[in-house]
Swiss-Prot record:
Sites annotated Important for catalytic activity: 120, 140
Keyword terms, alphabetized: Fatty acid metabolism, Isomerase, Lipid degradation, Lipid metabolism, Lyase, Multifunctional enzyme, NAD, Oxidoreductase
InterPro entries membership: 3-OHacyl-CoA_DH_CS, 3-OHacyl-CoA_DH_NAD-bd, 3HC_DH_C, 6-PGluconate_DH-like_C_sf, ClpP/crotonase-like_dom_sf, Enoyl-CoA_hyd/isom_CS, Enoyl-CoA_hydra/iso, FA_oxidation_alpha_subunit
Residues involved in NAD(+) binding: 325, 344, 401-403, 408, 430, 454
Keyword Oxidoreductase listed: yes
The protein's annotated pathway: Lipid metabolism; fatty acid beta-oxidation
EC annotation from Swiss-Prot or TrEMBL: 4.2.1.17, 5.1.2.3, 5.3.3.8, 1.1.1.35
Description of how the protein assembles with itself and partners: Heterotetramer of two alpha chains (FadB) and two beta chains (FadA).
Protein's UniProt name: Fatty acid oxidation complex subunit alpha
Active site: 451
Cellular component per GO, a single term: fatty acid beta-oxidation multienzyme complex
Organism: Pseudomonas putida (strain W619)
Amino acid sequence: MIYEGKAITVKALESGIVELKFDLKGESVNKFNRLTLDELRQAVEAIKADASVKGVIVSSGKDVFIVGADITEFVDNFKLPEAELVAGNLEANRIFNAFEDLEVPTVAAINGIALGGGLEMCLAADYRVMSTSAKIGLPEVKLGIYPGFGGTVRLPRLIGSDNAIEWIAAGKENRAEDALKVGAVDAVVAPELLQAGALDLVKRAISGELDYKAKRQPKLEKLKLNAIEQMMAFETAKGFVAGQAGPNYPAPVEAIKSIQKAANFGRDKALEVEAAGFAKLAKTSVAQSLIGLFLNDQELKRKAKAHDEIAHDVKQAAVLGAGIMGGGIAYQSAVKGTPILMKDIREEAIQLGLNEASKLLGNRVEKGRLTPAKMAEALNAIRPTLSYGDFANVDIVVEAVVENPKVKQAVLAEVEGQVKEDAILASNTSTISINLLAKALKRPENFVGMHFFNPVHMMPLVEVIRGEKSSEVAVATTVAYAKKMGKNPIVVNDCPGFLVNRVLFPYFGGFAKLVSAGVDFVRIDKVMEKFGWPMGPAYLMDVVGIDTGHHGRDVMAEGFPDRMKDERRSAVDALYEANRLGQKNGKGFYAYETDKRGKPKKVFDATVLDVLKPIVFEQREVTDEDIINWMMVPLCLETVRCLEDGIVETAAEADMGLVYGIGFPPFRGGALRYIDSIGVAEFVALADQYADLGPLYHPTAKLREMAKNGQRFFS
């Protein structure tokens, strides 16, 4: 053994060839943390000092190569001054450079995935051989930063600036065949031939058949583009990528700027450019928020996994209520491998549900994400029925009938008598109390809420609602089923609106106040979209359905009359009474036309102004900043209340629920991280400026205490 550490070993294989193996003890994956980087430095020094070494293979002892840097260390590192961050990056890069500069040929054998720093390690090798099942990529832009271990320097010099920009700016994982096509890897082999393929390459380099020094040289030099080619390549790319990423996500464009700035430099000087840009991005609020989201997501996955121990396996599911929602749930279950019965009392509803599932599967086939054979398999896994004849073996039933408590209670009581005693019943309600619905059941311990968001196939969140009598097994089984469906489940306790809708309706409440104060709803939409929401509140209400919003608001007003009840008529009342229900019937705040692709397109309709005129009670002058605060303060305060009331267990779950459930701007990190970014004391002072707007704007006593003590929601 030439070197042995806790993350890396170097051992002799044959004929002077050694294997540098990443295998981080106590972890399921390899990642670059302080320990791994330090051991890489020591391992390279040990190889350098051993005169018998003629070639090096870099491999992994795990199912994946290296997943990247240890993100948990980012949080502390990114608090350092910018100059220290630059110095730290350059120090790490000296280690990669030392590996790249070894006097012997080096080959990376890539299995599983090599992402971020994992791929950057491979780029420092002379050759790369990749398993057919492996994927590689530089996903750093998704964290608000760009590659910092030489990715913006080596990749453009290896595969050309155009290809490198595409890889870095998109941040996606790339398959072996695509990597080979652009020259990111030198060979692709079957997984079982990876070691042999790497050995073959290194032997050919040792024998002189391959000139590894010539292969290495372009990575050490400036980019092979003249001034005109540089201008055309980089300026065009910046314009295109800026349009794709938008103004709130600067990392992709900054990555291109870094490549451009370093184009005329050799490796070492180019790495200095990369380090400076990386440190600058690391200090931005966008990076802090996106890294926070990543860590929150990991926390969510850990919490969901903890339910696996007691969860029952769901081998057969059922959905009650077909139509668009039922069809979406059936599709999601079937496409992820759980057969499902789809029951309704009407043949036309069954047909609608089947059409929805078939359309979604067809879309996946068109995009190459599913084979026709797999589509047929998924369709066969959805069994439509008008009776309970096949319900005896069902493990979980998702009730998705009309949002009416009496109808839901009747349907749930009926199906309870048709399933086995330990079958789980789950209601896909968006606002109705689970405790109320449970009163109709003989086995309330087997009953939970399972709130999907529309459209089911696109929205990643599922709220699993724990009622007073819900058993932990029922909760755990529902969480496991949601995960199996490819969703991100969050367990919340019962209350009107649960987490997401309880928080969303105060946001709509702020919107209603603005419209009643004479503020143009089109302007409000533009301001909130610029703030980062995927759509403004008026457009969102139209998409959700004015009738759905009207019903939800009444439920919330009944549940929280002190702050959510408003005796005055609102914009939603006016539209509802005028039968302007939004996209579903072609008119809401906006009117809707069909575009070339057959999708609804919103257009301004002046007749809505007459409908809204009676609910405009004043003409108040407000700034764009006021609009943001009228909307965001009540949303944030209600999120705080949900955390304080124990509706949601952690700040991480609260924020992720809003990002996954209603499209809260990811670059702002969620409502609680948004408060942190302003400062808790500053946020309380901000809310107090709008206290005259009512109780929705009044901070809780506990939040005031946090402000006084200088506390935060996230460390």
